[in-house]
């Protein structure tokens, strides 16, 4: 049984760990940063710091949730409310973003910020009133156990519906994730290829319609 609750600042380190391991060699991050590191340990440490800053910068204006099993956080998600402003450079600086400059350099950080905006541009343009799924991460040791689907169906979708949201969008960059989101009721509406540091990365945009009276499994599961 997974219990869901809104994350607090004390949870950010654990969420960063989950995110770093879930997205450690995700094409979206690999193409931007991996070549700046000499070994996997230093790259993984940097990824954890990057995700911690991202969570801190976005959680102030948006909602971050965790799934808890036997007292341990095993899944996490960050969703952005279209009525709230997106985190900007100032928000990232306040969240400790300057600590990300070494060893990759400031220009690479700023370039990644713009790269991220471009990656989600189709979602913002075609579905400007939609909620946006920024992060969905699960414990690697429990992948395949339904944690990601549970977070979507039992926590995020009921929450967005309760807030009056009618759409939820996201992007992904792997074939495996494409299948996962289709299985969970999302529809792909855009496909592009992004280029970064000589690498080509597939970028797929998805949207789910959330009717006002959509029947979900976990309407009362969020604490």
Language-model-detected regions and their locations in the chain:
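A short helix-loop-beta-strand connector motif used in the catalytic cores of GNAT acetyltransferases and
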Residues: 45-66, 132
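A short beta-loop-alpha structural element at the N-terminal edge
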Residues: 3-20, 24-30
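Conserved acyl-donor/pantetheine-binding loop and adjacent beta-alpha core of acyl/acetyltransferases
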Residues: 78-135, 195-199
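Conserved active-site alpha-helix within GNAT-family acetyltransferase domains
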Residues: 174-191
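Conserved acetyl-CoA-binding loop-helix of GNAT-fold acetyltransferases
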Residues: 138, 144-158
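Conserved catalytic-core motifs of GNAT/GCN5-like acyltransferases
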Residues: 169, 187-205
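Conserved beta-hairpin
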Residues: 61-77
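Conserved GNAT acetyl-CoA-binding A-motif
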Residues: 130-131, 159-173
